[in-house]
């Protein structure tokens, strides 16, 4: 089966291509009775849309969302919700030079070898443009999680290239185009990106996402563990090459006496597990980090081959993000929210009536 759908009970199926007439998604399984307007979704899309600063692609897309179904008189009906976002600023002529060649680092070669046909315009189906519908669906998931359980899903940039971004306060995240939680470091990030763009090169980034207020019990062992589904969803984001839950790869150097989060009547002591044990949420913050590779489209000539297997030199034109990580924060937030709402509904379906005598301890003992 083709892999265009995410989720089990709350499913999202995306459609469209970068330079097609429109992109969008169909959400199935959204509970009825939730107030929902296009403005609720647009607010999240505006955080991701291109052309918002000199540090991202200058493709000008309003990303205005249309709700085609599943909402009546401002309330979800429980039927499929179709979201449509029209493409308005395609410039396909910029890709005429790669009709017969493959861009290094892109999905051109693999899509061609798998399907025997590819839409070369802006990467077609493999373009990060297709993350817009994910953010639209994520807005629906975020709203339901917040209103039903008080769950908040927030993210920020924790590193841009070799520059670490120390966390100061959540209030800074919405005040700069990098989603940096530290206002003092923004000038350094801007200078770094200006120099990078002048060199015609690109760089990667690290994004951290935190879900707070998640109840204990979400997750379906053994093959649909909460952290496993989170990792899969995050790896589905374009350019993501690594995922960490909690301490992640730092766990390798930690002793068991350090890594194991002790339990006390007052709460957990530490959260190295990232809010998940045995594939089930603990009630602590769920913490996720993703590593995003440098953008493959750069101005430097690159070696490649033609469809006939002959050597070729590829020069990439078009409008591209020198760091796709700059706009990735709302995408990562949306992916986490989509996994959480799916598991919330799955838990309710099987274990909604389960009660134990053990009190639910706090996420932190401090």
UniProtKB/Swiss-Prot annotation:
Cofactor binding remark: Reduced FMN (FMNH(2)).
Catalytic activity: 5-O-(1-carboxyvinyl)-3-phosphoshikimate = chorismate + phosphate
Protein's pathway: Metabolic intermediate biosynthesis; chorismate biosynthesis; chorismate from D-erythrose 4-phosphate and phosphoenolpyruvate: step 7/7
Gene Ontology, cellular component aspect: cytosol
GO molecular function, one term: chorismate synthase activity
InterPro entries (UniProt xref): Chorismate_synth, Chorismate_synth_AroC_sf, Chorismate_synthase_CS
Family named by the database record: Belongs to the chorismate synthase family.
Name by which UniProt lists this protein: Chorismate synthase
